[in-house]
Amino acid sequence: MPTVTDLIDLFETEATRERPEADRPDVGIIMGSDSDLDVMSGAHEALTALGFEELTDYDDPPDARFTFETWVVSAHRTPDLMYTYAETAADRGLDVIIAGAGGKSADLPNMTASIAYPIPVIGVPVQEKSVDSVIGMPTGAPITAVDAGKSYNAALSAVQILARRHDELVDRLRSILEDRRLDVATVSMRLHERGTATFREEREDE
């Protein structure tokens, strides 16, 4: 069973290794507890839809050019792990971090943003009561944040940041937007043709 020290050693060791850029994770997804995963899985969904693959073994990276990693890093229970994760982020190849936390003391996004600076950190309040904690950063300590539970949007924002350097991601972002536009058109026509009562019945049966 791995210990916190094992994970700290892993991050520190990985930070010293020379790997091709394509073999390093571009986006890091972290959360304070595995109970946050249902909310944070939206980021996984968005990145996967945009052609990213999840890196689960640093020594055996996916074939995809763009990858992400996922970890549980608690600001309160494992502050040393959080510090090491954020401090080594740049040297491990990360360009953006998506950090989610719940409760009224949702400190993981804020602390990560402070330590990983200048790497951009996108905070995801897992619950409504976490919003004030996540966005409450003082002047000079920036963090970007989405609304409660919107980890999907956080991932889109992360890819928008990466797209400034990678034109192919611009095309992927435009494609996913066009898919959503088509969804609206399809639903609109279906509602019009079926009528409100029938449309609602069919939607309830789906």
Tell me what each language-model feature is:
Residues M1-R24, R180-E206:
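Haloarchaeal acidic low-complexity proteome signature biased toward cell-envelope/secretome components but also
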